[in-house]
Each structure stands twice: as structure tokens, then as C-alpha cells.
Amino acid sequence: MRFHGDMLLTTPVISSLKKNYPDAKIDVLLYQDTIPILSENPEINALYGIKNKKAKASEKIANFFHLIKVLRANKYDLIVNLTDQWMVAILVRLLNARVKISQDYHHRQSAFWRKSFTHLVPLQGGNVVESNLSVLTPLGVDSLVKQTTMSYPPASWKRMRRELDHAGVGQNYVVIQPTARQIFKCWDNAKFSAVIDALHARGYEVVLTSGPDKDDLACVNEIAQGCQTPPVTALAGKVTFPELGALIDHAQLFIGVDSAPAHIAAAVNTPLISLFGATDHIFWRPWSNNMIQFWAGDYREMPTRDQRDRNEMYLSVIPAADVIAAVDKLLPSSTTGTSL
């Protein structure tokens, strides 16, 4: 659990703890760069950040000892671990919590790891949300919250609505985030353009979003240039995670690949179309009952994880026509009286 989308998949655990222990103060330890996606969650007392692997060794060491000092001072009663990172086991050993629970990872069976926790729980469930919740089994909690959550302040939506007004976008808009961290999770730009044209023909505005990376912005621009009527690109690379949550929450539909925004759409209960390639499309799928998911494995054989080529665009086998058909299932047939 190290990326932005992963953090949203931990929120049912946070909500379940808060529901069963309403007076508890729940702190979350996560990578520093993923803090923004949970920054507005009202059920979290404090967020503590770990330096990521790109940081200098000296920065990581200083950060580690700072965390030890701060976390020890908090005198926790309970630690719940949802990651297989070695540094966490070391940290947990240095904290004096009475109960320390972790998932029992098959590749973490050393005596050092196992003795770092008071309880090791076998992973259960077909989806990561179910697997995360299963770690609470030793607590014997009465009820579990099984919905992911994404929180944002009113100011985030106020800014997004202002930007939409400036771009001439009304209430009937669709958000598409075509980008992902790696090419094997991406879909063809031309197919995104075809889907956008279909949405425009049905009377919907389209807002393209992305990260600020130059490759992401280049992808957005190429998609826009391939459309008969360009979508709104002014927000690409320019929104915070809480703002993205607000934007997607008020959208009629979200379309995206295996990346954090799809999990945001699930968390705010916006209808979504999700495209997966050579990844576990069941375990990592967005946690939503209001979704149509496409998996490239339904169109051609997918490689195992150890044989996966990270430079191959596996999603290319998914036809634009199939995604457009899914649009018609999730959206009202037309907002203008026209159709393809």
C-alpha cells in the first residue's frame, strides 16, 4: 500500500475503527507524497509521512528517527499494519503498543517480521478492501464499514465550479483521466478521442484531467487535438487531490484507467468506467457497484506479473466502441436530443 489510490482503499479500515471506537484518535503513517489524498478525512487525527525511495539517504534516516520520537510520544494502544515494507516492521518494534496487528504476508515469514507483531492475520477476500478489513478480525469488532471515502472541503468544489464556469461547462460533464504512472496501464489516445466525440454528440461536456508531469500533459493535448470538438483541458495538471475529488463527485460519469482517480470516483459514488490491462483486475478494481470495468484479458491472453512488459500497452485490445456502449448504459441517453 504505497500509492495514492492504495490510500483510499485503506479508508474502510479507518472508518470501521472509528465506528467501533468512536473516542479513539486514529493516526495514519504513509508515504509523504500520498498525504494529500487523505488530508481532508475527518476521521483521521494526524497524518505522518515517510520519505519515499527517491529521497536522499540522509533525509530518510533523519525522517526515520524523527518518526520514532514522535510516534513513541503518542503512546498508541493499537497498531494496524497494511503494508509489507520492512521499515514498518522495524518501526513497530520500537513502539510500545499493547496490540500490534498485521496481515500475514506469504513473503514475510522471517522470525524478525513475525515477532514484530502480536497478531498476524491471513489475507482474506477477493478485493483489497476486503483483504484490508480482514486484518481487524482479532479485535472482534461488531460491524465493518465497507465503503471507501474521499473527503474535500467546500472551498475545493467552489474553486472547481468557478473554473468550470470560466470554461463554459455546465452541470452535465464527464471527467476523463487518461494517464497512469506506467504505459502498460494506458489506453490509446485515439480511442479516448473517439469516446470524447461520442460524449459530445450526446450533449455532455468533457473535462480532461492529469498529473502535472510533461508526459501527462502531452498525452492530454494529443487526445484533445484528435477530437472533433476539443474537451476542456485547462484543469489538467492544476488540481489538488481534494479538488479532483470535488470535480469527480459532481460529474455525471468518470472514465479512466487503473489509477488513483478511478478509486476517487468509487469513493464519491460517481458512475465510472474503468479500464484494466495486465494487472489483477479483481483484487485492485475500484470498490464500486456503480461501475463497468473492462479488462484487456477478456480480449486477449494477459501475461503473468513476472512476464509483464511494462512498455507494452495491453489495453489497446479494448475497442472504443465497447467503451462507448458502456457510456450509454451508465448515462441518460442524451441531454440534447441527439445521438449517434
From Swiss-Prot:
Its EC number is 2.4.99.25. It catalyses: an L-alpha-D-Hep-(1->3)-4-O-phospho-L-alpha-D-Hep-(1->5)-[alpha-Kdo-(2->4)]-alpha-Kdo-(2->6)-lipid A + ADP-L-glycero-beta-D-manno-heptose = an L-alpha-D-Hep-(1->7)-L-alpha-D-Hep-(1->3)-4-O-phospho-L-alpha-D-Hep-(1->5)-[alpha-Kdo-(2->4)]-alpha-Kdo-(2->6)-lipid A + ADP + H(+); L-alpha-D-Hep-(1->3)-4-O-phospho-L-alpha-D-Hep-(1->5)-[alpha-Kdo-(2->4)]-alpha-Kdo-(2->6)-lipid A (E. coli) + ADP-L-glycero-beta-D-manno-heptose = L-alpha-D-Hep-(1->7)-L-alpha-D-Hep-(1->3)-4-O-phospho-L-alpha-D-Hep-(1->5)-[alpha-Kdo-(2->4)]-alpha-Kdo-(2->6)-lipid A (E. coli) + ADP + H(+). One of its GO terms (biological process) is lipopolysaccharide core region biosynthetic process. GO terms for molecular function: ADP-heptose-lipopolysaccharide heptosyltransferase activity. Gene3D superfamilies: Glycogen Phosphorylase B. GO terms for cellular component: cytosol. It is an enzyme of class 2 (transferase). Pathway: Bacterial outer membrane biogenesis; LPS core biosynthesis. Disruption phenotype: Mutation of the gene results in loss of the branch HepIII residue on HepII and impedes the activity of WaaY. The keyword Glycosyltransferase applies. The keyword Glycosyltransferase applies. Keywords: Glycosyltransferase, Lipopolysaccharide biosynthesis, Transferase. Glycosyltransferase involved in the biosynthesis of the core oligosaccharide region of lipopolysaccharide (LPS). Catalyzes the addition of the third heptose unit (HepIII) to the second heptose unit (HepII) of the phospho-Hep2-Kdo2-lipid A module. The transfer of HepIII seems to be a prerequisite to the phosphorylation of the second heptose unit. Belongs to the glycosyltransferase 9 family. This is Lipopolysaccharide heptosyltransferase 3. It comes from Escherichia coli.
